[in-house]
């Protein structure tokens, strides 16, 4: 153990300290040097000595700037690190920063500050970081940042310093816990949280041109709140300690009524990593070693434009050439991962939750990409909440649970009179996604170490209140909403004299996904695989059971159950939806249960039991209400497709030994209802383009595990899932299809097939052998199918080429084949 001294642990110094105590925090532009403001640095940061831990700011933490011409404004602050003393091990928080400026900014070619290495920099740049903790001490939080800008900010090639990545940058980082904790039997210190960020912009933000630099991106406003890494526990071998919890990202709020122009139609920004209009990232950091839980992502709120009805106020225009991603508005809340356990008394660290987001635009957004296609998700509005993955387990412990995605639900809204338009392949209109983190895997080579559960997910809601969404490109969705449960972790494989291996973790449950489109709204896509509205609620798949190899007997791990899908529903209350392109549906809503995990394989000399397959997850209702007009023109471009599909059961694991029993295949689950109510006009123009297609489909049962040995029993197959109600109600309106095999209405309820029984192979040398093949299990039944025309004014017409006005089917799947005993293998 260290003695209590007053020395500080060294931490890196920023080169900002080189400016000394008199820092020109608001730098006059070259075009007007008659107005300037000198702001003295406060605290000790400006005069820090080499190798000394320090605190303070370079540039005043509070600045008020009038109507002058400037080049740059900045403030960077650090909290003091803890010291190696029992009462002073905690890091201090970073200072809060407030900038209120009415200046007009034209950036200078020479950057008057040196950026912290973990900042994107900006014409207005703020940075605050908490101090590091010592031993088990808690790291300091990043300070809060408030920026209010009233003036224009302009950046051109001639004034580009070549390094900054935004016009307005706000960064708050929590300090990190101690990675070298030598206080005996102590837990790791928690990482500091990122501070809250509030940015209000009234000024025009313009990047007219830039020097190409693929090592950076460019954003109009870029706000990042990030937690610090949790500190390491002293030792996983002695006592029962935990790694420090990772710091959470802070909340972020951006309000913008200034125009944001990045590039132009004649001069797009070229060769950048990314081009984003308004960007907010709240990111938790990892827990410390061992088994530290991750830090959560914070809530994000972005309000763009004014509710006064002028959609040009706060308009965002993005012109990008060959960037990895292009986004008008971008929100990302990431829960971090838990760390692996090396301590047999504790599970792997839990993954943390992603935060909720709320995005609202009253102003137009245009994103145009040229050159090579984006490598990352791009669109007019892109919002993502991601749970962190769980850490791996160790001997007789379980992998950490995956974090939840958007645990409290998230919304995106496009207001009346607003147009969100994109041009380019793989550039969507409005995207809202939430995903649970993956459960941690069990440790291989360790006894009975199971996978962790996947994270659950909250609801996603997308609203279009009289606005327009327009996309032009391949796989350029109009609206895309998804809630996806996390995958269960895999069970650890093991080799031992006797015992069992770990089971797979359960998949996480999905949240509901909804869309509401009002009268006056328009959603238009041009290009193949570009559905106007796509909504997915998908349960996470179960993890795979671990394999087991032994001498005296043992069993493999069971597969984890799949997570449940939730409701996927849209109310098109008078909106106009049109697509032009193959497989570009008008509306696609899907609820899908996660598949069960595969059982593990058991191999040995005596009694062996194959792992059972996991059960499939259930599916929720897939529901469409339509009173608007839907038009498609392309091959297999259905007007409305509603599907509820339950997860299939996992296949069972095989067994090999003198006495061997294959695992039982997992049962599939129930599908939900697939329901469509329409009183609007639906028209399709392509071949195989059905007007309305509603399907409720049960998943298939998992196959039973095979067995190999002298006395063998194959595993039974799992039962198929049931289809439930598939219904279409026409309350007036019309359906017209013109292509071949383009039915007006098709409704189906189909049960899933039962799983095959496991086969057996009897291997004997000079002795009789006994083998029993596994039994098959029955398939699921189909449910009710109902098509109703409640209004005699309704009409359904089809073109030539064997289409039917109405096609309905309900079918139960048959049982799968029971396995036969294979011929003996051996010699008398």
Please name every model-derived segment.
Residues 133-137, 291, 396-397:
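Charged, low-complexity interaction regions
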Residues 71-98, 134-138:
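Extracellular beta-strand-rich solenoid/capping regions of secreted or surface-exposed proteins
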Residues 51-61:
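Cleaved targeting-peptide boundary
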Residues 59-78, 96-129, 145-168, 173, ...:
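Beta-strand-rich solenoid/repeat architectures in extracellular/passenger domains
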Residues 1-31:
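N-terminal secretory signal peptides that target proteins for export/translocation
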Residues 77, 139, 172-174, 179-185, ...:
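Structural boundary/hinge residues at secondary-structure and domain interfaces
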């Amino acid at each position: 153990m260290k003695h209590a001294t007053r020395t500080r642990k060294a931490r890196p110094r920023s080169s900002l300290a080189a400016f000394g105590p008199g820092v020109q925090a608001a730098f006059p532009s070259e075009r007007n040097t008659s107005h300037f403001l000198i702001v003295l640095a406060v605290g000790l940061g400006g005069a820090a000595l080499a190798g000394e831990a320090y605190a303070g700011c370079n540039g005043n933490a509070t600045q008020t700037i009038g109507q002058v011409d400037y080049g740059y404004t900045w403030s960077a602050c650090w909290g003091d690190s803890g010291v190696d003393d029992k009462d002073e091990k905690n890091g201090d928080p970073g200072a809060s920063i407030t900038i209120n400026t009415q200046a007009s900014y034209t950036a200078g070619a020479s950057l008057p500050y040196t950026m912290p290495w973990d900042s994107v920099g900006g014409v207005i740049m703020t940075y605050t970081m908490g101090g590091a903790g010592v031993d088990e001490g808690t790291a300091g939080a990043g300070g809060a940042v408030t920026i209010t800008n009233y003036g224009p900010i302009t950046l051109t090639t001639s004034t580009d310093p070549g390094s900054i990545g935004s016009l307005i940058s706000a960064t708050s980082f929590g300090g990190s816990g101690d990675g070298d904790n030598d206080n005996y039997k102590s837990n790791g210190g928690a990482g500091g949280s990122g501070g809250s960020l509030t940015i209000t912009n009234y000024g025009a933000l313009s990047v007219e041109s830039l020097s190409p630099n693929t090592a950076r991106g460019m954003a109009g406003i870029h706000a990042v709140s990030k937690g610090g890494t949790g500190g390491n526990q002293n030792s996983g071998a002695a006592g029962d300690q935990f790694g420090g919890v990772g710091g959470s990202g802070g909340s972020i709020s951006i309000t913008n009524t200034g125009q944001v122009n990045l590039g132009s139609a004649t001069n797009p920004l070229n060769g950048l990593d990314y081009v984003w209009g308004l960007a907010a990232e709240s990111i938790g950091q990892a827990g410390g070693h061992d088994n530290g839980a991750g830090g959560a992502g914070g809530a994000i709120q972005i309000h763009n434009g004014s509710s006064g009805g002028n959609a040009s106020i706060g308009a965002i225009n993005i012109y990008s050439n060959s960037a990895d991603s292009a986004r008008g508005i971008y929100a990302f809340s990431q829960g971090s991962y838990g760390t692996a356990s090396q301590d047999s008394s504790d599970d792997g660290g839990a993954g943390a939750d992603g935060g909720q987001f709320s995005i609202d635009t009253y102003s137009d957004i245009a994103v145009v990409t040229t050159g090579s296609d984006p490598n990352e998700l791009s669109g007019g509005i892109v919002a993502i909440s991601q749970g962190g993955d769980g850490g791996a387990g160790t001997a007789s412990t379980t992998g950490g649970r995956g974090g939840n995605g958007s645990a409290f639900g998230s919304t995106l809204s496009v207001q009346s009179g607003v147009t969100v338009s994109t041009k380019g392949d793989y550039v969507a209109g409005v995207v809202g996604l939430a995903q649970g983190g993956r459960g941690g895997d069990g440790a291989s080579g360790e006894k009975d170490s199971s996978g962790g559960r996947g994270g659950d997910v909250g609801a996603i809601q997308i609203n279009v209140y009289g606005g327009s969404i327009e996309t032009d490109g391949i796989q350029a969705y109009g609206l895309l909403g998804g809630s996806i449960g996390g995958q269960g972790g895999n069970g650890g494989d093991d080799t031992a004299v006797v015992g069992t291996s770990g089971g797979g973790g359960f998949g996480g449950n999905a949240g509901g996904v909804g869309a509401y489109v009002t009268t006056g709204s328009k959603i238009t896509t041009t290009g193949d695989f570009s559905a106007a509205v796509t909504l997915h609620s998908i349960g996470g798949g179960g993890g795979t059971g671990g394999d087991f190899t032994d001498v005296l007997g043992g069993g493999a791990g069971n597969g984890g159950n799949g997570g449940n899908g939730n409701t996927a529903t849209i109310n098109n209350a008078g909106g106009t939806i049109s697509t032009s392109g193959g497989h570009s549906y008008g509306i696609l809503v899907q609820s899908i249960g996660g598949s069960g995990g595969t059982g593990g394989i058991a191999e040995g000399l005596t009694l062996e039991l194959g792992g059972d397959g996991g059960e499939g997850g259930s599916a929720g209702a897939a529901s469409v209400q339509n009173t608007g007009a839907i038009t498609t023109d392309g091959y297999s471009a259905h007007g409305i497709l509603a599907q509820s599909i339950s997860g299939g059961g996992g296949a069972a694991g095989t067994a090999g030994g003198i006495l061997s029993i294959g695992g039982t295949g997992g049962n599939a689950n129930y599908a939900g209802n697939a329901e469509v109510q329409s009183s609007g006009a639906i028209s399709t123009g392509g071949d195989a383009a059905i007007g309305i297609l509603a399907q409720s489909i049960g998943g298939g049962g998992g196959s039973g595990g095979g067995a190999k040995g002298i006395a063998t029993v194959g595993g039974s197959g799992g039962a198929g899932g049931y289809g439930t109600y598939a219904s279409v109600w026409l309350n007036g309106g019309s359906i017209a299809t013109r292509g071949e095999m383009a039915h007006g209405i098709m409704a189906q309820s189909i049960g899933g097939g039962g799983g095959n029984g496991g086969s057996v192979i009897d291997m004997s040398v000079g002795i009789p052998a006994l083998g029993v093949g596994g039994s098959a299990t029955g398939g699921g039944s189909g449910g009710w199918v109902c098509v109703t025309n409640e209004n005699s004014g309704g009409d359904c017409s089809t073109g030539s080429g064997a289409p039917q006005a109405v096609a309905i089917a309900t079918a139960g799947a048959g049982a799968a084949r029971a396995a036969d005993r294979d011929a003996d293998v051996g010699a008398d």
